[in-house]
Amino acid sequence: GDLAQSIYDYRSIDNWSDVISQSFDNDCKLEYLLKSYRTTMEIMNSANLVLSHIGLKTATPVIRHGEDVRYLKIKENDYNRILERVNLLKEKDYQSIALISRDTDEAKEMADNLAKLGLDIKSIGEDNVDYDSGICSLSSELSKGLEFDAVILTDASEDKYSSKDNTDMKNLYVSMTRPLHELEILYDGEITLPLKEEAEKTFIKR
């Protein structure tokens, strides 16, 4: 399994040492699969900043280049500007676009408010997980295992993804590695620490 995606503390492990000693009596060989085939090099390099922060092995992206990860400082409830960002992605004819929030309540609120502005968007929750294509809003936890053409993280601030909390960091990593082609990271206030330096260099002013 991928330790970086073990987002549930009550049923996850921090390393393989205990498993090797307790389940295999140290009689096994541990191999690491470090290739990433989903995302572009640019997205994976940014996501690796999160892994490095929590001391996990970083993934090696296959040689597929794309656009740089984009950072935009924006108020969490500035739905008109968020809609602008979604529409820019829609113009590229992507089949699947996801807005990923920290939890399900935030994801539903995002979907409801964007729908009021006329966006055709589906809210994905624990009781409503059907999704084929189009634009959707969901939590970081529910995004695990899914992939989209493009992803917008709705708020990657330190308040939402604490750099001192490994579960937050793993959820951030999961969210960042969902897109096939493009990743845009919005944040309100201070961006989470692992992404701070990169965001300061590459943020979008408008």
Pin down the residues of each PLM region.
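Conserved helicase motor core of SF1/SF2 NTP-dependent helicases
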Residues: 1-206
